[in-house]
């Protein structure tokens, strides 16, 4: 039989980079979202600012005031609604042998449509206050990947196409997206309203495009002749990529564009409702290689050469061109514009007691394979400058996930935090999906 696994690996391996996908900064619970509730007081004392619950009255500590801050951060997450952590470890990290039992575990979890996503971020930024306006500037790095794939696609990769002799494998849905870019941005936030409890903010950034790879298809299928003499690809598809023959975490510049972020919040004495719209923008990519087809295409070669580069991540332009052109599909090279993977985030948090705050929200990334991610968090203050933030979420590229945020402040100036999504990976890797972490260091003055 013909070696067709490289076709499907090409369509789905763009996500094979180390690295979920969004995270809320745990240090926010010691700063922007810090619990200001203090000891229970006599409700007749009118000197202190207070807030009352059904049974208790609390005093409110004065809000932390600061002129400027500086922060550096990094994060990497990977998640899937089908592939387990054990499989990800073997396939992506250790490159170890994937035995039949591990393959079958994945097959048993597969559905008609499966997804996987990777998000790697790093950056530094600062902010300074001018009267009631805060001006922000920063530099960020992002490598984002997502894919949807069918159960047949997985079987073709790891079992080959012998089982499909004389049959048609359904590769629908099949969509892949990978983008690597860096952003230099500036923004402002301003407090408005009669009660001075509404914050509006916006950022504008200039984007340096590094790498771009995208596959869109409709009704994709692959037929294998009974005697293995040929393959027939049926689909309407578009394949586009920048010509990166050697993988690099920071590719050469292949395009440029603009991006913007928008922020709104309204604040009560012990609660805040916020809406964020992030990464609204585009990149104009230069000299993008594109293959487009709509119909039936036959391949009669003896063997399909590996069209994935040596590191298993990027395309091999030479072998890819040979494969498509052998079926009569010619490439075009042109400049194209694509939108960035934007995110809508709605959240609400509330301080319940001096030691407990809760927050909940929903996050939606506008890419294939991502479903709205609903989450809830409980912030428990061991002290006023040390907080634990366990969370439970469902959605995104995965299913249910458990995370733990930890944040500690020192001398009211230094904040160190981390967010960990490793418990499922360690405790039950063969039954769970998704892992990652973030770290951040901030200095306020």
Model regions: which residues?
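A generic alpha-helix preference that emphasizes hydrophobic side chains
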Residues: 10, 16-17, 134, 403, ...
């Amino acid at each position: 039989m013909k070696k067709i696994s490289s076709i499907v690996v090409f369509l789905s391996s763009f996500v094979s980079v180390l690295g979920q996908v969004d995270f809320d900064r745990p240090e926010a619970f010691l700063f922007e979202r810090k619990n200001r509730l203090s000891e229970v007081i006599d409700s007749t004392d009118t000197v202190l600012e207070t807030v009352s619950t059904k049974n208790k009255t609390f005093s409110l500590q004065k809000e932390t005031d600061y002129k400027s801050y500086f922060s550096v951060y990094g994060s990497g997450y990977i998640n899937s609604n089908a592939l387990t952590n054990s499989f990800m470890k073997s396939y992506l990290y250790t490159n170890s042998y994937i035995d039949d039992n591990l393959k079958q575990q994945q097959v048993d979890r597969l559905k008609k449509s499966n997804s996987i996503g990777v998000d790697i971020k790093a950056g530094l930024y600062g902010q300074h206050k001018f009267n009631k306006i805060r001006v922000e500037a920063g530099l960020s790095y992002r490598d984002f990947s997502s894919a949807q794939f069918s159960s047949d696609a997985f079987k073709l990769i790891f079992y080959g196409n012998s089982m499909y002799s004389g049959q048609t494998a359904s590769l629908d849905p099949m969509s892949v997206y990978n983008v690597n870019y860096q952003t230099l941005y500036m923004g402002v936030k301003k407090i408005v309203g009669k009660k001075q409890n509404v914050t509006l903010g916006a950022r504008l950034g200039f984007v340096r495009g590094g790498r771009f790879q995208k596959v869109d298809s409709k009704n994709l299928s692959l037929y294998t002749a009974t005697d293995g003499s040929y393959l027939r690809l049926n689909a309407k598809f578009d394949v586009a990529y920048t010509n990166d023959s050697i993988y690099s975490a920071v590719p050469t510049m292949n395009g440029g564009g603009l991006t913007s972020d928008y922020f709104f919040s309204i604040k009560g004495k012990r609660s805040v409702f916020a809406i964020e719209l992030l990464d609204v923008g585009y990149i104009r990519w230069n000299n993008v290689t594109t293959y487009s087809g709509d119909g039936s295409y036959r391949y009669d070669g003896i063997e399909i050469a590996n069209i994935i580069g040596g590191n298993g991540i990027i395309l091999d332009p030479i072998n890819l061109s040979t494969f498509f052109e052998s079926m009569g599909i010619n490439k075009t090279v042109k400049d194209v514009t694509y939108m960035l993977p934007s995110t809508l985030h709605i959240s609400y948090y509330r301080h319940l007691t001096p030691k407990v705050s809760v927050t909940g929200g929903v996050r939606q990334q506008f890419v294939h394979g991502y479903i709205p991610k609903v989450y809830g968090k409980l912030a428990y203050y061991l002290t006023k400058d040390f907080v634990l933030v366990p969370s439970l979420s469902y959605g995104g590229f995965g299913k249910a996930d458990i995370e733990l945020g930890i944040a500690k402040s020192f001398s009211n100036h230094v904040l160190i935090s981390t967010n960990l999504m490793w418990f499922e990976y360690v405790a039950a890797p063969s039954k769970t999906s998704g892992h990652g972490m973030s770290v951040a260091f901030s200095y306020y003055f």
